[in-house]
């Protein structure tokens, strides 16, 4: 997730109330932090917290020194908070297409999400959009990049994360801090998703080894995530075909319900996909809609394209990959250039 802090502190007059409230929360959660170094030197710091902070330091160092990501003061401070995530984010799509509802922000351009520190505020925005006929999703976000506006801290709820999850999160957000393209939310998230996951696996191999439980668990977790994304991609393609027809909007909505119901039945039947972990149990209960599918598409649709570039043109080096992304970004549409380059 990127730039949420800037969303809270930039905008037009119609957003003043939103900006003032969310900006105050941003300051609350980014101040009153403790330097990691002083906590490590403090003998009263618990062993659990100490080990966690050392792990975060190691991940951050790896991201900077080995992956070539930006060296800044993110994740050098710690914040104790009594919640299990940071913000609730609203996204919406047209009910009969994958046209995303966009919010306009100075500096960042048009983005398909809006964040809130209090769930009732997010639910209110979601209700407003549902009344307008949009498919809506409200999701929990555990971290975001403020692109240098503040020093992004580590939060106490992250202590429960697996090594892969915390490494992927930190590297994902540091990727945003390293390269951000205005108005290109899909590319920004796809790039950060790819670098975050690939970088996390590299760090795990170096730190724990490929035969370790930490690495094997990460492989299983990623295999399940890839399978889940492939299932959603297949569903999205079926719905896209429905939306491309010349039938009426009402007929499209009816057919959409049929396609989603059929998809859910397939998740629970004899031919149900086999997942390695319990993370994706009870998928048939998912509240699937265009906003949900669009969310996953934004983060993953062109990850295979970026992976192919990473392997073929960067020799499997994230450092070279990031350098190439910066060079392509300076010349225009990154993904168009990647596709063209791979076709040669």
What is the role of each PLM region?
Residues 18-23, 220-227, 287-294:
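A ubiquitous short alpha-helical element
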Residues 1-10:
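Bacterial N-terminal signal peptides
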Residues 58-225, 237:
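Acidic/His-rich structured neighborhood in mature extracellular/periplasmic domains
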Residues 44-45, 58-68, 175-179, 196-208, ...:
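Sec-exported extracytoplasmic/periplasmic mature domains
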Residues 29, 42, 49-56, 115-122, ...:
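Solvent-exposed, acidic/flexible segments
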Residues 229-344:
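Pan-zinc metallopeptidase signature
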Residues 30-47, 103-111, 285-287, 304:
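Acidic/histidine-rich, surface-exposed loop or edge segments in extracytoplasmic proteins
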Residues 9-34:
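Bacterial Sec signal peptide processing site at the extreme N-terminus
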């Amino acid at each position: 997730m990127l730039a949420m802090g800037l969303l809270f502190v930039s905008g037009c007059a119609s957003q003043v109330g939103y900006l003032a409230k969310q900006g105050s929360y941003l300051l609350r959660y980014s101040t009153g932090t403790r330097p990691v170094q002083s906590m490590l030197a403090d003998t009263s710091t618990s062993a659990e917290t100490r080990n966690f902070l050392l792990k975060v330091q190691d991940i951050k160092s790896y991201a900077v020194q080995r992956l070539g990501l930006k060296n800044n003061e993110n994740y050098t401070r710690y914040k104790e908070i009594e919640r299990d995530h940071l913000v609730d984010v609203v996204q919406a799509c047209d009910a009969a297409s994958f046209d995303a509802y966009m919010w306009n922000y100075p500096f960042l351009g048009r983005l398909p999400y809006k964040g809130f520190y209090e769930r009732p505020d997010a639910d209110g925005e979601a209700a407003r959009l549902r009344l307008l006929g949009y498919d809506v999703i409200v999701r929990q976000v555990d971290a975001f990049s403020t692109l240098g506006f503040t020093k992004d801290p580590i939060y106490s709820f992250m202590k429960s994360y697996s090594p892969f999850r915390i490494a992927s999160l930190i590297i994902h957000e540091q990727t945003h801090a390293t390269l951000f393209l205005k108005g290109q939310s899909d590319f920004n998230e796809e790039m950060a998703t790819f670098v975050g996951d690939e970088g996390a696996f590299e760090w795990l191999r170096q730190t724990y080894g490929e035969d370790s439980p930490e690495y094997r668990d990460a492989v299983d977790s990623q295999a399940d995530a890839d399978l889940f994304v492939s299932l959603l991609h297949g569903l999205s393609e079926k719905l896209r075909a429905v939306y491309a027809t010349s039938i009426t909007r009402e007929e499209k909505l009816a057919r959409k319900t049929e396609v989603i119901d059929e998809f859910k039945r397939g998740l629970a039947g004899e031919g149900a996909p086999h997942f390695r972990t319990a993370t994706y149990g009870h998928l048939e209960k998912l509240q699937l809609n265009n906003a949900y599918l669009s969310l996953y598409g934004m983060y993953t649709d062109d990850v295979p394209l970026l992976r192919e570039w990473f392997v073929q043109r960067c020799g499997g080096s994230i450092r070279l990959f990031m350098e190439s992304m910066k060079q392509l970004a300076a010349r225009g549409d990154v993904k168009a250039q990647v596709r063209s380059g791979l076709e040669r």
